[in-house]
Amino acid sequence: MLVLLLHAVVLGLPSAWAVGACARACPAACACSTVERGCSVRCDRAGLLRVPAELPCEAVSIDLDRNGLRFLGERAFGTLPSLRRLSLRHNNLSFITPGAFKGLPRLAELRLAHNGDLRYLHARTFAALSRLRRLDLAACRLFSVPERLLAELPALRELAAFDNLFRRVPGALRGLANLTHAHLERGRIEAVASSSLQGLRRLRSLSLQANRVRAVHAGAFGDCGVLEHLLLNDNLLAELPADAFRGLRRLRTLNLGGNALDRVARAWFADLAELELLYLDRNSIAFVEEGAFQNLSGLLALHLNGNRLTVLAWVAFQPGFFLGRLFLFRNPWCCDCRLEWLRDWMEGSGRVTDVPCASPGSVAGLDLSQVTFGRSSDGLCVDPEELNLTTSSPGPSPEPAATTVSRFSSLLSKLLAPRVPVEEAANTTGGLANASLSDSLSSRGVGGAGRQPWFLLASCLLPSVAQHVVFGLQMD
C-alpha cells in the first residue's frame, strides 16, 4: 500500500520537476532549463501582456524581454527567494507600483532598459532590494528621478541610465558609497556641479559623453579619488577650471575629445601621474601651454588630432619623458624649425606618424617626416622657404607674342592717325578710344584725296611686318 501511495505521488508531480527541479510548473509561454543552483526561465518574445501568474520558485533568472507588459503591480512576481537576475527590457511599461519587486530578497540584477513610456519612477520603486548590484534604466526617456530613488540600494555597484533626458546629474546618485560604475551618456546634462558626485568614494568609471555639458565646476570630482575612467567627450566644453581634475591620482583614461576647447592648460593634468590614455581630439585647440603634459610620465597615447595646431613645442612635455604614441593628424602644421624636434623623434621612435604640413609653401602637402631642414653657417636650423608663386621668377618673364604685337599695332595706329586741332581733341570722349583705325579714317576723311592710297597701303602692310619682326625677336 505504501509503495502504491508513493508511486501515485511521484506520478502526480508537475513535469517541470523533471526538467528544472522547480517546485511549480514552467509557464506555458516560457522555456525553463536547469542551471546551477536552480532554473532559468525564458519568456522573451512570447507576446505576454502581463507577468505569468506562477513562476518556478527555484528560478534564479527570469527573462521577460520584448513583450507587451504595461504595468507592474505590488509583488508582481510573487515570492521568488532564489531569483538573482530579472530582465524586463523592451516592453511598454508606463508605471511600476511601489513594492512591485517585494518578495525578491536576493535580486542582484534588474534590467528595465528601453521602456520608453516609463518616464517616471516613484521614490520607493526599488524598496526592499537591499542586495541589488546592477540596475539598468537606459532609454526610458526619464526627465528626472526622485532624490531618494536609490537610497534603499546600499549594495548598488553599477547604474546604467544612458539615453535618458536628464538635464543634470541625478541627485539620487549622491551618497551611493558602493557605486563603482555610472553610465550617464547620451542625455541632456548641461553641467557637472560641485555637489553632483558627492559621496561617490568608490566610483571607478564615469561616462558623461555625448551630453550637453558646458561647465565642470571646480571640485566636481573631489570625492572621486579612486576614479580610473572619466569620459567627457562630445560635449560643449569650451573651458575647464584649473583644478577640474585635482585629486584624481588614479585616473587612467580621460576623454575630452569632441568639445570646444581652444587651448590646453598646464594646471589641468598636474595630478594625473597615472594617466595612460588622454583624448583631446576634435577640439579647436591652437595652443598648448608649456609643461602641459610634463607630469604624464605613464601616458601610452595622446590624441591631439583634429585641432587647429600649427606648432607643438617640446617644452609642452618637458621635463617629463613621453614614451607613448602621439596622434597629430588633421592639424594645419607649420613645418618649420619649431617642429624639427618632432621630425627627429618620428624617425627615432616610430611612435608618431601622419603629420601633414600646411606651410611653409615649399613643403605644403608633405608629411613632416619628408621635410629636410637646412643649416646655416653656424649650424642653426634654417626654415623651409615660403613660396610666393606670383614673385618666384628670378627675372621679368618674357612678354607674350600677342601682347607685343598688339602694342606694336597700337604704336602704328598712333603714328598713322591724323593730327587734329587741339580743340577737337579736347572734345573727344573716352568711348572713342576704342574706335578702330578704319572707323577713324572713314569718319574724318584724313589728309585729302592725294594722300589716301599710300596711307591705306601702309596701314594694311605694316601690322603684318610688325608680326614678323616680333616673331624674329622672340626666336632670338
From Swiss-Prot:
- Which InterPro entries does the protein's record reference? Cys-rich_flank_reg_C, Leu-rich_rpt, Leu-rich_rpt_typical-subtyp, LRR_dom_sf, LRR_TM_domain-containing
- One Pfam family, short name: LRR_8
Classify the main location. secreted
Question: At which residues is glycosylation annotated?
Answer: 92, 178, 295, 388, 427, 434
Q: What cellular-component terms does GO give this entry?
A: extracellular matrix; extracellular space
Q: Where is the LRRCT domain?
A: 336-387
Q: A GO term (biological process) for this protein?
A: visual perception
User: Where is the protein found, in the record's own terms?
Assistant: Secreted, Extracellular space, Extracellular matrix
LRR repeat intervals: 60-84, 85-108, 110-133, 134-157, 159-181, 182-204, 205-228, 229-252, 254-276, 277-300, 302-324
What does the record say mutating residue 182 to K does?
Answer: In CSNB1A; requires 2 nucleotide substitutions
Its keywords, alphabetically, are: Congenital stationary night blindness, Disease variant, Extracellular matrix, Glycoprotein, Leucine-rich repeat, Proteoglycan, Repeat, Secreted, Sensory transduction, Signal, Vision
Give the SMART domains listed for this entry. LRR_TYP (SM00369), LRRCT (SM00082)
In which tissues is this gene expressed?
Answer: Expressed in kidney and retina. Also at low levels in brain, testis and muscle. Within the retina, expressed in the inner segment of photoreceptors, outer and inner nuclear layers and the ganglion cell layer.
Q: Which disease is it linked to?
A: Night blindness, congenital stationary, 1A: A non-progressive retinal disorder characterized by impaired night vision. Congenital stationary night blindness type 1A is characterized by impaired scotopic vision, myopia, hyperopia, nystagmus and reduced visual acuity.
Member of which family?
A: Belongs to the small leucine-rich proteoglycan (SLRP) family. SLRP class IV subfamily.
> Which PANTHER family has this protein been placed in?
ANTIGEN BSP, PUTATIVE-RELATED, CHAOPTIN-RELATED
Its name, as the record gives it, is Nyctalopin
Native species: Homo sapiens (Human)
